[in-house]
């Protein structure tokens, strides 16, 4: 879509426990989504079980499922499909407001460090 603000999120197979245990940690999942809403605009998967994983994104795009919806869904572990949720988590975590984080710190009395998430960070 022309003029649409979007971000790209990725999750490497080398951090996907199922891929590691199968001896196939080479590959990645990449998703392009609207910055504000998490609406999926496109996705690509390179690696083991790519054909199975891309289906999740195809269904999501066709039915208006957002990265937030995927991130809120429990996925089996260890499974390649967990990579779908982990890439969705990239969007979810980056949308947490610093103000909300500070409120939580105050309410729960947390004084330790708070991780800073950016487009190149993997959660």
Model-predicted segments: where are they?
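Flexible, glycine-rich terminal cap/loop adjacent to redox cofactors
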Residues: 1-123
């Amino acid at each position: 879509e022309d003029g649409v603000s979007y971000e790209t999120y990725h999750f490497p197979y080398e951090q996907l426990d199922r891929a590691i245990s199968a001896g196939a940690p080479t590959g990645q999942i990449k998703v392009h989504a609207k910055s504000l809403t998490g609406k999926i605009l496109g996705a690509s998967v390179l690696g083991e079980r790519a054909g199975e994983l891309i289906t999740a994104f195809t269904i999501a795009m066709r039915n208006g499922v957002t990265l937030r919806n995927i991130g809120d869904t429990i996925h089996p572990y260890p499974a390649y499909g967990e990579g779908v949720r982990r890439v969705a988590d990239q969007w979810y975590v980056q949308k947490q407001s610093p103000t909300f984080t500070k409120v939580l710190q105050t309410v729960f009395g947390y004084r330790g460090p708070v991780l800073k998430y950016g487009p190149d960070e993997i959660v």
